[in-house]
Curated annotation (Swiss-Prot):
Leader sequence residues: none
GO CC terms: plasma membrane
Broad enzyme group: translocase
Binding-site residues for ATP, renumbered to this chain: G58, A59, S60, G61, S62, G63, K64, S65
Keywords noted in UniProt: ATP-binding, Cell inner membrane, Cell membrane, Membrane, Nucleotide-binding, Translocase, Transmembrane, Transmembrane helix, Transport
Organism ancestry: Bacteria, Pseudomonadati, Pseudomonadota, Gammaproteobacteria, Pseudomonadales
Name the UniProt record assigns to this protein: Probable export ATP-binding/permease protein MacB
Function (record text): Probably part of a tripartite efflux system.
Naturally occurring in which organism (per UniProt): Pseudomonas entomophila (strain L48)
Enzyme Commission no: 7.6.2.-
Membrane topology term: Multi-pass membrane protein
Primary localisation category: membrane
Gene3D superfamilies the UniProt entry points to: P-loop containing nucleotide triphosphate hydrolases
Keyword Transport (UniProt): yes
Amino acid sequence: MNMTVEWSPQRTRATEQGQPLLRLAGVSRRFMAGDREFLALKDINLQIRAGELVAIIGASGSGKSTLMNILGCLDNASSGSYQVNGQETRDLDDDALAALRRDHFGFIFQRYHLLPHLDALRNVEIPAVYAGVPQAGRHQRARELLTRLGLAGHLANRPSQLSGGQQQRVSICRALMNGGEVILADEPTGALDTASGKEVMNILLELHAAGHTVILVTHDPKVAAHAERIIEVSDGQIVDDRRTVREVAKPVEEVQPAAERAPRRLVASLGLFREAFKMAWIALISHRMRTLLTMLGIIIGITSVVSISAIGEGAKGYVLKDIQAIGSNTIDIYSGKSFGDSRAKAIETLSPADVTALNELYYVDSATPVIGQGSLVRYRNIDADVQLNGVSEQYFQVRNIPLAEGIVFSADDARRQAQVVVIDHNTRKRLFAPGVEALGQVILVGSLPCTVIGVTAENKNLFVAGNSLNVWMPYETAAGRVLGQRHLDSISVRIKDGLPSKRVEEEVNKLMLQRHGTKDFFTNNLDSIMQTVQKTSRSLTLLLSLIAVISLVVGGIGVMNIMLVSVTERTREIGIRMAVGARQSDIRQQFLVEAVMVCLIGGVIGIGLSYGIGYLFALFVKQWEMVFSLGSIVTAFVCSTLIGIVFGFVPARNAARLDPIEALARD
């Protein structure tokens, strides 16, 4: 293939000063095989200058691959010194070694080592991603490299859609992406046919002519013959280092730099994070079924938490609405010390004068006397046992009792002890046949004839007996003409809107204590009941949510298990990313982002399912509905993110700790 590669390596300090680019002094590498120590390299001394074309040749097991791994900063020497461009590598940490690989070395592998789920363009871009190169510059450089190597029509092809020769050319482009000052080619033609192998060698020779330092690692003398210097390794030692008759290619003077790096650390970090999301998305959609199964536990957990929260809010609203329907902002005053006081009936101190005094309080909107007793009512030949209530005209406002028809009695009716009544829906049904007008009819209450002037609306309140029959008449009429009772059974007080009921209750107690001189009464604050209901509802919702959280935890464990499997399956991918310059933090971030993305997507689906359940719930349950709150949605997203981080950490940490050499060797 006749072509010219214009992307030349950047000049280095070693090149400018004539120093060796790579220097090994007394390098040995030992491995433990069980209890025995194995010496792979023995006292290696080697210098390679910039622009050289070197072949390292040796039989299988000779140590040439170990030497290449040390040269490429994939491995560390057990002893001795190795310098890259004058920088000692012995004391560098993993991230610093990754930076050396990223900025100085380009790897070409025998088996290409392309990521199968990425197309050619994205495979080539990977080193630049970890170098923090902006996206536009990265895309442009990758396209130009692939075009120069004859792959312009295969940018969107995945490795499985390319021939062996094409895959190796993609691998070469990837090696050049960050400049490729040193090209390390491990058996670059070993898996290719003769024509493709010749094509790849021509590319490597042209790269050498362009000024790149090219190191071939091979067992094939024919491949080694292309080099200007051949280093033979046997039993972990250099047994021969000779130059061939080939002339040393001179580096070109016009150096075109690699793609421009991100100017600021923050920009680079954001770019890496964005790319991590893109790569995570590609990895997830390439294993759709596994991703869906991984999400399943999260989906169930989030659906449970959000739905239970919505059901709890709906139930609380339903109960509070019913409490408000029987009189919100209301305080009732009764004789005795508390409900169930056996002496309460003997206490007859509540009086109409107390009602008058209460009505004068600033905090009180209205106060009404209440007396009541069971009574017999009759209309023609139909009679019924009802609860007779003597109240003031304000009672219906205090208790939020709406009228279906007619009016309530007035203050004038009360003064005149008018024989008028308001009946409830159940009494109307009991006394009057369907179609019979109740208003204006005269019924007997005990022995007192009374005219029906109003009918209340049907009451389906949770806190009111649905089958009870009630009749209301003016307090003065009930006390003077029916019951013969002057003291009150209770007083109902309505608080002005916007005022704290607890404070008003204290003032009411203070006034009543002053009037009576003793605590012969007690109060019942409906707002306190509402607060109790709210507190109980929150407690129940929390309890049920904690139960639902268990399914979230189970889902999180499922995510961790699948991610651990994913790390095992993608070990070689991790090795490839490390070889091209990924730091441990980059690998850790990659797998953490994948775990969080799985959980977030599962959370979104779970929230959607919850809304679907809410829609179906509304179709079949008419009395009340599920109430979704922004807080529950935010909580769901926070839970999803935390589950992803917590249960994705161990797989991400394991991935980041992998040895790049072992990872690359994994099938």
